[in-house]
Amino acid sequence: MSFYTAGLIHRARPGYRIIPESTATEDIELGAIGEETPLLSEGAVTAVEESAAVGLPELGAGLAGAIGTHADVLYRNRNVFKSVLTGNYTDLKGNPLKQRNAISEKTKQLGRGIFQGDFNRAFPDDLKLETEQEKKDLLRYYNHNRRLAGLSEAYPQGKGYAYAKSQKVLEAERRGLTVPGYKYLGPGNSLNRGQPTNQIDEDAKEHDEAYDKAKTSQEVSQADNTFVNKALDHIVNAINLKETPGNAFGAAIGAIGIGTKQAIEKHSGVIYPSVSGMSRQINSKYLNSWHDWIEQNKHNNFEGIQLPEDFYTEEQTLSDSPMSEGTKRKADTPVEEGPSKKGAHNAPHNSQGTDPQNPSSSGATTSXDVEMAMSLPGTGSGTSSGGGNTSGQEVYVIPRPFSNFGKKLSTYTKSHKFMIFGLANNVIGPTGTGTTAVNRLITTCLAEIPWQKLPLYMNQSEFDLLPPGSRVVECNVKVIFRTNRIAFETSSTATKQATLNQISNLQTAVGLNKLGWGIDRSFTAFQSDQPMIPTATSAPKYEPITGTTGYRGMIADYYGADSTNDAAFGNAGNYPHHQVGSFTFIQNYYCMYQQTNQGTGGWPCLAEHLQQFDSKTVNNQCLIDVTYKPKMGLIKPPLNYKIIGQPTAKGTISVGDNLVNMRGAVVINPPEATQSVTESTHNLTRNFPANLFNIYSDIEKSQILHKGPWGHENPQIQPSVHIGIQAVPALTTGALLVNSSPLNSWTDSMGYIDVMSSCTVMESQPTHFPFSTDANTNPGNTIYRINLTPNSLTSAFNGLYGNGATLGNV
């Protein structure tokens, strides 16, 4: 017996079947075959052996002759091949063999929930089910999926299951019938067996993939014809010495196999592979009365035509008929064509006058004919009742008008170069007398990075061009320490010496403002013989300030003056530092604040909130990289809500537990015995001060603004960012420890930093009114203001700013 005959008989043993690659394993039910019924007759075996033995001379004469030689034998054994290829086992007469009852869908769903696809685990013997039969069915489901996953060395023996004794047999089943030396040439193979061995094996793989995707008998036949044509090309090329004989051998085997299959299927219909579509027979009453119309339209499977509900009858085995389940359009079946095609195809008229308007071939109109005509494609269905009947048609949804205004995101990035000073710590303030509370400041070297102000991110033009409703959604700063410089005198007196190896420390901090221990100040005076010791302070400087200790403002400092109307444009030194990439100074430094005679117990430990570095080890390193997303980053006046509807004065609205008024907390200063916090309410208003949305206002405004007419808000403040060079002592030969002499001699020191600043601004200009000249929004997105102005130049309390007055000159 040949290899192919043995393989075919092996595959025909009871209990075996070929599993298509695309079939879901959990939906495959392997039933038992029952008794050992022989499936192959000697005629079928002889046909297979003789087909495999056909040589090149016979192929040269034509494959049709070889197939025709055994056509009778192949037809008589068509049920054998159908059983082997599909797993639907029958006897030689085509009668189905007794099979085990299929596992119910309920059991499958239960199995999916228990095992979750993991069949490597043991079956839970203690599982409690309603009936013993359910447990048996669940065990069958479990064992079946283990076999499919290759987790079982042998099939469980017993009634209802065929078995294999080794993993080798299981692997052979997955492999299917393949020609030696090939991976895909043969029926029933998986699609993932690796790279094909040669060109004919590649053609066989493409043929298998076409099978896997086939949904109709036409697609199956097309795949077969394509493969046979390619196989014949390989044979001809081999005869002309254009290809190797190996390709010709494989091509011959493949062509004979497919040719044999096609010969069988001419009598039995397509039996392999199993396709999803099922043909339906046309109702006999339409076959008789619409015969000519059907003949004219069946070539395109009645594409785009609304067919009567009873046009087809019971399902039959799929054959070469061009009409299939897929050609019938139901009302709930989605299609790609537009609504204009639904029922819009008029049936053509034939030469004999028979048409869907009057399908009766005799010309006599009966009640049945009228009923059929009313359901006919292209006719006014139901017109006899006074209107168009849309039964069976797809629902047509009319598109609604909609304007998507979208949101524009713009990113503004700047690169600044700053110089900072190694300022000494010094306690400054007026002299206190008696029990009077006197202000005290202790200066630090921590320079403030003003990242809460817009000029760090954008120039005046960029700000002015932003439309109403623009808001910052994210801002980021990166602080890179470049290096530091320590200066000393080389011709000093005998009491001072120059030193080249001083230690220089660098300090950074994020969020000091939330501590509430201090404030940022600008230094206005220094000790005459010690320029690193500040002696006087004033409020921090951001905007232009006039006077001897004034400041031209961040905009002019970074970007220069306007050449059209700024008198300072031509002044010496008023050049734009950012525009030319040069260094400028940071104006404000952090100071701790305290009052005397308040019983607070001295200065808190600021150092525990600082990060300190040896400056020699962090040159050209990014020491701070922080991002902040404002909760209310509105930087332009908000969009308006245009009140319409009746009445425009809405009256009193019940809002439940929503807050209508903004809440405030009145905090009384120490001592502890007199501290108190009381609640205050503030009405919301749509009146906005002019300076609330200028370029120098703080980005975060959640303490001031409220989204919507009521609701809950949790305001927050933007954390501060500081960096500083610690003061470097000036060493002397004097006895500094004598009489506890204070260390008040400092070497001039400076640091150089780069600040990369970036902010993202969102803008949108929606409108709901066709003639509105400004953008508008709905009430829920309208911004209201609390009639209270927190002061960010003061110290925070519990993470928020109060509305106290700014500290004056100290």
Swiss-Prot record:
Entry-linked InterPro entries: Capsid/spike_ssDNA_virus, Capsid_VP4_densovirus, Phospholipase_A2-like
Compositional bias ranges of the Polar residues kind: 348-366
One of the protein's GO biological processes: virion attachment to host cell
GO cellular component assignments: T=1 icosahedral viral capsid
Leader sequence segment: none
Domain of life: Viruses
GO MF annotations, alphabetized: structural molecule activity
Location of the protein in the cell: Virion
Entry keyword set: Capsid protein, Clathrin-mediated endocytosis of virus by host, Host-virus interaction, T=1 icosahedral capsid protein, Viral attachment to host cell, Viral penetration into host cytoplasm, Viral penetration via permeabilization of host membrane, Virion, Virus endocytosis by host, Virus entry into host cell
Annotated region described as Disordered, given as residue ranges: 316-366, 373-392
Residue ranges with Gly residues bias: 379-390
Function field: Capsid protein self-assembles to form an icosahedral capsid with a T=1 symmetry, about 22 nm in diameter, and consisting of 60 copies of size variants of the capsid protein which differ in the N-terminus. The capsid encapsulates the genomic ssDNA. Capsid proteins are responsible for the attachment to host cell receptors. This attachment induces virion internalization predominantly through clathrin-dependent endocytosis.
This protein's name: Capsid protein VP1
